[in-house]
């Protein structure tokens, strides 16, 4: 006990071992759904689901463990929602790249991320991007997740006349997915920990009776990670056509992870002005996890906002994160259950997370059209072009041009001009996806 006290400085942070254990369990329950959702999404890109399941558990455990031991922060890491969907449905299925090349793009973005963190450039870049565009990126990814989830559940379907139309509302997947979404929202409103996880499991159990799904068991030895381990194609990812993908991964990773880390740390009272040493360690842990995740075989890893649930339960140190890491390692034994989860069981989770991401709309300045219009264009272009990259491109270009045309070019940070120019060059000479 004394060793734990000394390592995590529990007394200094006003917490106890018991409180940290409860906080760790709380955080885990709120984000454990990722071990089911991530293999489902990346599996649609042709990746071996069992191997992705192992990679997801391992990188969540490794990244969170480093966060706890190195930064002493009660923050958990795992493959991020949104970027996994972009990886699977846009980069691989839409743009035609292999998943190995997509992993290579994640690796390169992770290296860039690590470099800007080591050289303390991250804060400079973050400050250079307008707050409205940062908020719009979150909203756009939320809408992107929504359209993917509705399609996975069968609630919407393709239509040559109207582009999209209503699916078969009498089919078991649609009924079960709708029920799962209502369960998640209800449990969340009642402040039940693990609402998303419970919703996924309930729909999965019902699918055995009403959805024609087969039960493969619950516990077994972990499957092999060999099909995805070190399978990334870095050389192909360095080609010009993948620059667009790398830029998207890099920008979203940076905004999402930095915002989450600072938000949760602030809520825990760990963000002290002028003392950024621990935060910089947390940023390094986050950057390193992206790098390692691509080697194991999963999309970009990020800090989870669900960590706030553990902070709310009293978590204040890295011991909370260590507990989460141990629980993710334990998940390696439930691979048969993960393989039994159908796409329409994870669809409600995607839709719920997507809905929550729309809350950033309230942060937009609706009185200034040079701010809100680029934000709206960014958010709307993502689902309607089925591409996060296009949303970013249209948003940055629109922002720069509107400020220029209205005589407010001086308000535009140099970083915006650079990113807008890169996207313009890409559209003019490479084409768009």
Named regions from a protein language model:
Residues 46-65:
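Loop-to-helix transition at the N-terminal end of transmembrane alpha-helices
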Residues 25-32, 62-65, 69, 150, ...:
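Hydrophobic/aromatic residues within the transmembrane alpha-helices of Major Facilitator Superfamily
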Residues 60-81, 112:
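Juxtamembrane transmembrane-helix boundary signature
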Residues 95-209, 322-433:
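Membrane-embedded alpha-helical modules
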Residues 2-38, 59, 80-138, 266-361:
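Helix-loop-helix junctions within the multi-pass membrane cores of secondary transporters/permeases
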Residues 40, 65, 69, 90, ...:
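Membrane-interface helix caps of multi-pass small-molecule transporters
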Residues 40-52, 90-101, 242-243, 342, ...:
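Helix-coil boundary and interhelical linker segments in multi-pass alpha-helical membrane proteins
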Residues 1-51, 164-166, 197-280, 424-425:
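Helix-loop-helix hairpins and the membrane-proximal interhelical loops
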């Amino acid at each position: 006990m004394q060793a734990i006290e000394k390592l995590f400085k529990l007394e200094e942070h006003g917490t106890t071992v018991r409180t940290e254990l409860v906080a760790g369990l709380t955080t885990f329950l709120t984000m454990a759904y990722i071990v089911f959702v991530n293999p489902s999404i990346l599996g649609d890109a042709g990746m071996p689901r069992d191997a992705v399941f192992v990679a997801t558990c391992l990188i969540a455990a490794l990244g969170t463990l480093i966060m706890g031991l190195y930064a002493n922060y009660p923050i958990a890491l795992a493959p991020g929602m949104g970027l996994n969907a972009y990886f699977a449905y846009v980069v691989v299925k839409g743009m035609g790249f292999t998943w190995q090349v997509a992993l290579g793009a994640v690796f390169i973005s992770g290296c860039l991320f690590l470099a800007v963190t080591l050289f303390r450039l991250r804060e400079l870049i973050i400050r250079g991007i307008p707050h409205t565009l940062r908020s719009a990126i979150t909203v756009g990814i939320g809408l992107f997740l929504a359209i993917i989830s509705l399609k996975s559940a069968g609630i919407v379907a393709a239509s040559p006349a109207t582009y999209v139309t209503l699916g078969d509302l009498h089919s078991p997947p649609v009924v079960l997915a709708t029920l799962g979404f209502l369960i998640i929202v209800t449990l969340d409103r009642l402040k039940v920990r693990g609402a998303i996880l419970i919703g996924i499991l309930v729909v999965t159990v019902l699918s055995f009776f009403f959805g024609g799904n087969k039960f493969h068991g619950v516990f077994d030895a972990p499957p092999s990670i060999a099909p995805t381990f070190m399978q990334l194609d870095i050389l192909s990812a360095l080609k010009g056509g993948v620059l667009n993908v790398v830029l998207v991964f890099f920008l979203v990773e940076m905004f999402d992870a930095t915002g989450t880390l600072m938000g949760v740390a602030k809520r825990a009272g760990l963000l002290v002005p002028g003392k950024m040493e621990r935060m910089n360690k947390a940023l390094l842990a986050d950057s390193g996890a992206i790098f390692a995740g691509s080697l194991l075989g999963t999309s970009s890893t990020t800090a989870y906002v669900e960590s706030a649930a553990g902070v709310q339960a009293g978590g204040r140190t890295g011991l909370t994160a260590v507990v989460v890491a141990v629980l993710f390692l334990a998940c390696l034994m439930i691979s048969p259950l993960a393989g039994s989860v159908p796409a329409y069981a994870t669809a409600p989770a995607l839709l719920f997370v997507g809905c929550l991401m729309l809350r950033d709309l309230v942060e937009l300045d609706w009185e200034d059209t040079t701010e809100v219009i680029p934000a709206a264009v960014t958010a709307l272009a993502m689902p309607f072009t089925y591409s996060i990259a296009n949303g970013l491109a249209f948003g940055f270009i629109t922002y720069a041009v509107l400020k220029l045309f209205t005589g407010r070019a001086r308000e535009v940070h140099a970083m915006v001009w650079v990113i807008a120019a890169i996207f313009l060059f890409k559209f003019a000479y490479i084409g768009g996806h």
